[in-house]
């Protein structure tokens, strides 16, 4: 079933002399209905197969404030065999989770007795106690219990938080998607979700990142950098370890409160350049003709086969790109490292390659060291330093969510990556099916279409644009543009409700 409606059956068996002990194998079935966050209705029947007896139980509970305040009023009643309703045994009571994992309860019984009790959770362990009283208020039987196993909500980490740095050791290429099997790479969404989780965790006071073996384009690094900047603005620390870093890598690392660099590493602030190889002379020498069909001034994709040098239009647009990239990197680096803009340009134009000693002297980094010595280095920089490895942090089970009738809608994240093609790259034939399926799925509240495409086949681009146009208004479509959304890659975006791009796109 679901959080709204569920059915269940069970079979119980006993051993020994069942007749002597008046015991029986049992068969039971039950149903639970929670149509909204305010009401819960349950019913259960148990049959004693050896005696032809049965018990019927019904219960109802109301949360007057929904899931926001876990106060519940409840009542139940049971009948044996064919008893009339006026013979039913019943009870009614209240349960209140005062704070997370601390629950108080009281119940009144049709026998005119009542009980009070409390339940205290320590996470994987819990203790509970209930005391019965008769109609005169005289105490009767009491019951105590200990719970072991499943993780429950608890207030104790909040009362005595153990602040730790989260260690993120990100190796290899950062991708959008990874293979189902035998792929240990990391995706962009995984990294962003990890940073977001750590940002709201009161037990995490910082992140320390191994950036020595990461491969990603400048746009992906910019997005992760923005998440780390938000993490910092929440009052938490960021430490990044580097060994060799170019201008993109240093731009990323500069967001950190502390940059730790390998003693034998280097930083190269080489700036940016875009260039092309031109093949017209080679083709002429080989007596091969090439005709460029150029419809617009800036459509320069194949001009390197038809010209001997860059056209003025292509030079103009490429210069705009590198100027923007450099301005963004310079602005972010100088703000983060509290550096004068002219001093940064001097570092780029005069030397550009810096050893660890020189980088420390120029305050490009804060200290030197290697990731293998991470804990020792961090202990020197932060008093009472403690850490938790990403594997243990993200593999931790979460407490059971006891929300009623809670089936959150989902956001579909769909990727259009590579050249615009019918059967390769964005794979338009299949992508159309994915988009239409998400449009028709009632559980999907919105669609995020991530585009990273230089363009290509106009037919493939129009396939995707058309399905978005036909479904316009059905549900929100947000296009997120990655490193490139050019030509047909931009065409894909046109009918979205919102288009989001980074300054580097």
Q: Model regions: which residues?
A:
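Outer-membrane beta-barrel porins/channels
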Residues: 1-154
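Short acidic loop-to-helix transition motifs that present clustered carboxylates
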Residues: 16, 111-113, 245-247, 373, ...
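Glycine- and other small-residue-rich loops at beta-strand/loop junctions that grip anionic moieties
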Residues: 20, 83, 106-107, 242, ...
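Small-residue-centered hinge/linker elements
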Residues: 140-340, 345, 353, 379-476, ...
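Short acidic-hydrophobic, aromatic-tinged amphipathic segments that line or gate anion-handling sites
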Residues: 260-261, 365-372, 501
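PDZ peptide-recognition modules
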Residues: 345, 349, 356-359, 368
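A ligand-binding cleft/hinge motif common to bilobed small-molecule-binding domains
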Residues: 372-379
């Amino acid at each position: 079933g679901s959080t709204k409606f569920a059915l269940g059956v069970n079979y119980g068996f006993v051993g020994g002399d069942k007749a002597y002990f008046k015991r029986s194998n049992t068969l039971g079935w039950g149903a639970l209905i929670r149509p909204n966050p305010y009401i819960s209705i349950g019913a259960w029947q148990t049959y004693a197969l050896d005696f032809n007896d049965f018990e019927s139980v019904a219960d109802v509970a109301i949360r007057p404030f929904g899931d926001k305040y876990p106060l519940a009023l409840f009542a139940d009643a049971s009948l044996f065999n064919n008893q009339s309703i006026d013979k039913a045994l019943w009870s009614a009571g209240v349960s209140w989770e005062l704070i997370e994992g601390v629950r108080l309860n009281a119940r009144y019984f049709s026998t005119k007795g009542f009980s009070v009790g409390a339940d205290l959770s320590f996470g994987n362990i819990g203790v509970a106690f209930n005391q019965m009283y008769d109609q005169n208020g005289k105490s009767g039987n009491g019951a105590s219990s200990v719970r072991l196993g499943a993780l429950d909500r608890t207030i104790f980490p909040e009362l005595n938080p153990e602040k730790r740095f989260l260690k993120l050791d990100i190796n290899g290429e950062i991708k959008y998607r990874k293979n189902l099997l035998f792929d240990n790479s990391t995706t962009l969404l995984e990294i962003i979700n990890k940073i977001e989780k750590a940002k709201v965790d009161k037990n995490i006071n910082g992140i320390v990142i191994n950036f020595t073996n990461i491969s990603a384009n400048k746009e992906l690094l910019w997005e992760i950098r923005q998440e780390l900047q938000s993490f910092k603005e929440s009052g938490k620390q960021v430490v990044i370890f580097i060994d060799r870093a170019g201008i993109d890598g240093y731009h990323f690392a500069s967001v950190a409160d502390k940059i730790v660099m390998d003693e034998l590493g280097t930083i190269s602030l080489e700036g940016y350049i875009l260039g092309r190889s031109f093949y017209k002379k080679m083709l002429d020498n080989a007596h091969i003709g090439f005709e460029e069909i150029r419809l617009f001034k800036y459509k320069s994709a194949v001009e390197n086969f038809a010209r001997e040098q860059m056209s003025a239009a292509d030079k103009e647009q490429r210069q705009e790109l590198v100027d923007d990239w450099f301005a963004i990197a310079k602005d972010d680096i100088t703000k983060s490292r509290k550096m004068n803009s002219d001093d940064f340009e001097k570092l780029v134009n005069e030397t550009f390659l810096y050893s660890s000693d020189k980088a420390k002297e120029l305050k490009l980094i804060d200290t030197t060291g290697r990731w293998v010595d991470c804990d020792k280095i961090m202990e020197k920089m932060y008093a009472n330093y403690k850490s938790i490895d990403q594997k243990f942090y993200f593999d931790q089970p979460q407490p059971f969510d006891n929300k009623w009738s809670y089936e959150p809608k989902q956001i579909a994240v769909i990727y259009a990556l590579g050249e615009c093609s019918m059967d390769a790259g964005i794979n338009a034939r299949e992508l159309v099916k994915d988009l239409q399926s998400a449009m028709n799925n009632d559980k999907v509240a919105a669609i995020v279409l991530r585009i990273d495409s230089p363009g290509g086949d106009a037919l493939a681009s129009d396939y995707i644009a058309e399905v978005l146009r036909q479904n316009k208004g059905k549900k929100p479509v947000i296009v997120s543009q990655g490193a490139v959304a050019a030509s047909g890659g931009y065409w894909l975006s046109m009918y979205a409700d919102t288009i989001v791009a980074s300054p580097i796109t």
